Amino acid sequence: MRSISVLGATGSVGESAFDLLMGAGGPERFRTVALTGGANVARLAQMARALRAELAVTAWPERLADLRAALAGSGIEAAAGPQAVAEAAARPADWTLSAIVGAAGLPPGLEVLNRGGTLALANKETLVAAGPLVMARARETGARILPVDSEHSAIFQALHGENLDSVEHVTITASGGAFRDWPLERLARATVAEASRHPNWDMGQRITIDSASMFNKALEVIEAHEFFGLGVDRLRVLVHPQSIIHAMVTHRDGGSIAHLGAPDMRHAIGYALNWPARAALPVPALDLAALGSLTFAQPDEVRWPALRLAREAIGAGGAAGAVLNAAKEQALDDFIAGRIRFTDMAPAVEHALALAAREAGFAQSPRDLGEVLHWDDFARRAAAQWQGAA
């Protein structure tokens, strides 16, 4: 029986994974080693009971008593806190999904790699903040990383059997998010509620707002650079409102291989779960005739300056990815809390990058988790101080 763990089980990606696991046989087919989640301990306990997990962990220490109460009589072990999440990731499992949102996903992701496990990676921040460290650790231990972001899963599939040297460039598509068609002058007045409505994908609030600002795509460009080893000159972004083509690989002979699929995370999760095989998934096949047409446009970097910042971070190298990621998280926190405007997020991130570039050691890629966390803390403080946000 295959053993699995899901980190971030109660988020949108975790819910999709749970749906797939239960549909594929649940505890009759999988031995669930550990599930981790956040504040929603009632849902975490419900999932743990359904999958007969050995361990359930909430990242919130103050919710441990509630989790234990929800698991009473089940025989499932309960734990709490970030260290407990990392320890859960360190437990041997054949396949571990990392779906924790933000930089909090890095320590448990490294624990999976340290034990040489298979890491199905939906947490893009792991590679953005610590790409060289993460990829080196995987090589050292023989661990395998399978991309679960829909775009990177699409690239991974389109590259199957291909020589990377023959690739001219890779195109990642973007829906354009909630404000794709808004007049530029209106963006400064955008509310959190408006930014939280995605036209195509059903996702959590933070990633939906990141989609509206295009910071989600900026992180994905950096992630593709780190995972596939592609230079910034071989990475492109196209606005594709229908979210049907997730990525395209264009070869030097002029031909392109695209991956098409419904905007449903269950496809990428299911592909990673069953790789290298393919299995039937509860995702409807595309009806291209019903779709009628697919449209594309070049992204406007005045509207979406995050894309420029991603290219600059790749060019700078060193700690730039860690700084961009943490500054973005802080700016997003400040926007959600009403401390800054939607259009202030990119300037706050750019401010943090400019300050970090003056610091000793910025040009050096983080060599361990401690160095990643140093730059994470620096960037959050710098972004929070931008124009008085604190």
Curated annotation (Swiss-Prot):
Molecular function via GO: 1-deoxy-D-xylulose-5-phosphate reductoisomerase activity; manganese ion binding; NADPH binding
Enzyme Commission number(s): 1.1.1.267
Binding site for 1-deoxy-D-xylulose 5-phosphate: K124, S150, E151, S175, H198, S211, N216, K217, E220
PANTHER family attached to this UniProt entry: 1-DEOXY-D-XYLULOSE 5-PHOSPHATE REDUCTOISOMERASE, 1-DEOXY-D-XYLULOSE 5-PHOSPHATE REDUCTOISOMERASE, CHLOROPLASTIC
GO biological process, alphabetically ordered: isopentenyl diphosphate biosynthetic process, methylerythritol 4-phosphate pathway involved in terpenoid biosynthetic process
Name the record gives this protein: 1-deoxy-D-xylulose 5-phosphate reductoisomerase
Pathway recorded for this protein: Isoprenoid biosynthesis; isopentenyl diphosphate biosynthesis via DXP pathway; isopentenyl diphosphate from 1-deoxy-D-xylulose 5-phosphate: step 1/6
Catalysis performed (reactions): 2-C-methyl-D-erythritol 4-phosphate + NADP(+) = 1-deoxy-D-xylulose 5-phosphate + NADPH + H(+)
Pfam families xref list: DXP_redisom_C, DXP_reductoisom, DXPR_C
Cofactor dependency: Mg(2+); Mn(2+)
Function description: Catalyzes the NADPH-dependent rearrangement and reduction of 1-deoxy-D-xylulose-5-phosphate (DXP) to 2-C-methyl-D-erythritol 4-phosphate (MEP).
Family: Belongs to the DXR family.
Name of the encoding gene: dxr
Positions contributing to NADPH binding: T10, G11, S12, V13, G38, N40, N123, E125, G204
Root EC class: oxidoreductase
